[in-house]
Structure formats: structure tokens, C-alpha cells
């Protein structure tokens, strides 16, 4: 508002892979405010853009992969993992995803990750809740995700320095 007609949006490209068989994106997510604005633009509308920033892609190695995400960090990590398993069909690397949320109602796409776990024995999905509610009846990991990973995975890992870490959130 203080800038007049200038609207600043921080847009990240974190889409799931394209399904060539159906010709659609594997998303199923309705557009939000930023996407709605972008899709409302008409030819000739002026926009100012900057970026992209960062370098967040899957490295072509055989090393173990450890994904660590929390909150909105789910989106780019989910995209990575769907590409890794649904497109590349990765079976030769150990892949672990540790997701942190406050309570059970903030866990997204759990079914997607459990399906990957079922199909790919080299993938494990773990969840930790930092503030589980009584009605969650939570029996899983409790605490902030970084501490849970340290205490329940990295502390006894034979070579944590050899892992590729992918973090967002």
C-alpha cells in the first residue's frame, strides 16, 4: 500500500513433477493469493521480477540423502522426493525425510510419503511434533526436528559427514 500499485510477492517454484501420461501437473492444490494474482495478469501488464536465487537441486551421487523440513518447507522437499521416486525411480540411495510440525493437524501429504515408503524400501519418512495436542494421541517423536534428528538418527550414524543434506522450512 505505501508503494502505490506495487505488489511484492515472493514466489517459489516448487511444483511436483509433470505427469507425461496425463499431461497434467501432479499437484491437486488450489492456487493461493499469489498464484491467483499471477494467473490474473494479461498480456501487456507490467511486472518487475528478480531472481532466481539459490541452488536447490538433487545432486547426482550415490550418497545417502537426508531431507529435513518443517512447515512450508514441505513444498520444495515434496517436489524433490516425488521427482526422485516417481520420475527417476531411485532405488540405489538411502533416502530419509524428517518432517517437523507443531501438531498432527499440520502434517501434510503423509499419505504420499507412506506410499513411497511402501514402494521403495530405501526410503523412510519420519515425523516429529514439537507441540502435540492431547487430542493428537501422538506416540511418535516429540521435539524440534533438528534435535530429534540428532538424538534419534545422527548421534549413532556411522558417517553423518558423508550424508547429503537437503533442508527447507
Q: PLM features: what roles do these ranges have?
A:
Residues 91-169:
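Reductase modules of NAD(P)H-dependent flavoproteins
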Residues 1-43, 101-103, 128-132:
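Ferredoxin-reductase
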Residues 64-68, 164-166:
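Conserved beta-strand elements of the Class I
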Residues 59-64, 158-161:
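Short helix-loop-beta connector
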Residues 20, 54-62:
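Short, Lys/Arg- and Gly-enriched loop/turn segments at beta-strand edges
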Residues 76-88:
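Histidine-anchored nucleotide/phosphate-binding helix
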Residues 70-71, 169:
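A short acidic Gly-Thr/Ser loop motif
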Amino acid at each position: 500500500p505505501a508503494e502505490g500499485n506495487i505488489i511484492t510477492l515472493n514466489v517459489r517454484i516448487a511444483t511436483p513433477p509433470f505427469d507425461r501420461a496425463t499431461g497434467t501437473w501432479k499437484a491437486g492444490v488450489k492456487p493461493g493469493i499469489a498464484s491467483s494474482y499471477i494467473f490474473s495478469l494479461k498480456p501487456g501488464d507490467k511486472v518487475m521480477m528478480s531472481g532466481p536465487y539459490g541452488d536447490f537441486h538433487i545432486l547426482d551421487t550415490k550418497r545417502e540423502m537426508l531431507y529435513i523440513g518443517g512447515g512450508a518447507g514441505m513444498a520444495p522437499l515434496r517436489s524433490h522426493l516425488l521427482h526422485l521416486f516417481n520420475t527417476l525411480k531411485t532405488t540405489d540411495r538411502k533416502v530419509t525425510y524428517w518432517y517437523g510440525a507443531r501438531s498432527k493437524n499440520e502434517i501434510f501429504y503423509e499419505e504420499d510419503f507412506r506410499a513411497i515408503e511402501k514402494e521403495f524400501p530405501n526410503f523412510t519418512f519420519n515425523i516429529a511434533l514439537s507441540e502435540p495436542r492431547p487430542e493428537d494421541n501422538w506416540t511418535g517423536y516429540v521435539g524440534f526436528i533438528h534435535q530429534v534428528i540428532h538424538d534419534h538418527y545422527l548421534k549413532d550414524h556411522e558417517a553423518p559427514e558423508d550424508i547429503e543434506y537437503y533442508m527447507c522450512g
